């Protein structure tokens, strides 16, 4: 069964409420994917044509560039439903923040999700060794986030939570914040089971 995203954001107070609704829809979308093992998003020619008039994505998803992690599949979303930002290790810098700001301020996207995943090579590199070339910038960022943690799963969690804190610090600390703290959610995708674990519920 296809998950339909219907909610439109009108103002900041509505955005907080809408973000909660969208989050629940993402959870249902992931449950549908885990159950069916199939892609249920709308990628029809009709949807593609409708989107030529503009986009109104329901969530920003910052995730790893890993080929096994496809947000639209994981959350049963189709064209135009997710504003996806991908970078190895799902790390945050000024470029990612700029993309988030564009989605939230210009496209009125109500929810930001940081999605890490199990078996992340960038996290493994931060745990076990030095990185050469440009990769070291990513690894150094993750190493700073995970500190002395040695467990791969816990390190993945810490990396995601650190990214969430950076986003909240960038957009939620002002008197008139672009994002409320409740509009930022942290999660980890299990590449074996297909399930998404939502960290903010327990931390």
Q: Where are these predicted regions, by residue range?
A:
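Divalent-metal-activated hydrolytic enzyme cores
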Residues: 2-54, 80, 90-98, 102-108, ...
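Gly/Ser/Thr-rich loops at beta-strand to alpha-helix junctions
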Residues: 66-68, 117-122
